From Swiss-Prot:
Oligomeric form and interacting partners: Monomer.
Organism of this sequence: Mycolicibacterium gilvum (strain PYR-GCK)
Role, per record: Hydrolyzes ribosome-free peptidyl-tRNAs (with 1 or more amino acids incorporated), which drop off the ribosome during protein synthesis, or as a result of ribosome stalling.
Official protein name in the record: Peptidyl-tRNA hydrolase
Gene (UniProt): pth
Signal peptide location: none
Length: 192
């Protein structure tokens, strides 16, 4: 039987953040839960919203932390431990300033590029050797700080494309689970 995968969409809890750029990981996780035919419930040991099922033929634990982005590791670490999932079988879905809006990139290991949610996860897992589905949100215009940009809703130019991008990020996540990092990168990175 295939080993389980922990897939975590990063974001901030609360309705005031639901449509912000930083919450694209939550948006993708919601699509994946729909594809699995499952709903999220609070996991007592970790405090995260969790559902279990199968994606791409593998058992999956799908989660959305219920703490602020910068503290995500507080719930991801206990989930990985509870389900006995190795860091290399953890997939984090997150927003990425350094990638143009709408582009999706897959990565395994490496630095966190100033993303405090990833830093928190790496600290909790004692390694950065987890996999990532990086959903491009682009850089802020002008002199606007990245910190304020990620907490803003998608603008009127971006919103019409958002549904397609979220579906593609969910597709990319399933390919990563099914094929592994390099074959999935070859496919996903050719999309744009």
């Amino acid at each position: 039987m295939a080993e389980p995968v922990l897939v975590v969409g990063l974001g901030n809890p609360g309705p005031q953040y639901a449509t912000t750029r930083h919450n694209i990981g939550f948006m993708v996780a919601d699509v994946l839960a729909d594809r699995m035919g499952e709903t999220f419930k609070v996991h007592k040991k970790s405090g995260a919203e969790v559902t279990t099922g199968r994606l791409a033929g593998r058992p999956v634990v799908l989660a959305k932390p219920r703490v602020y982005m910068n503290e995500s590791g507080r719930q991801v670490g206990p989930l990985a431990k509870f389900y006995s999932i190795a860091p290399t079988d953890v997939v984090i879905i997150h927003d990425e300033l350094d990638i143009d809006f709408g582009r999706i990139r897959l990565k395994a290991g490496g630095g966190v590029a100033g993303h405090n949610g990833l830093r928190s996860v790496g600290s909790a897992l004692s390694t950065n050797d987890f996999q990532r589905v990086r959903v491009g949100i682009g850089r802020p215009p002008g002199q606007k700080s990245g910190a304020s940009f990620v907490l803003e809703p998608f603008n009127s130019r971006e919103r019409p494309e958002l549904g397609t991008i979220i579906e593609q990020a969910a597709d990319a996540t399933e390919l990563l689970i099914e094929l592994g990092i390099e074959p999935a990168q070859n496919t996903v990175h050719a999309w744009s």
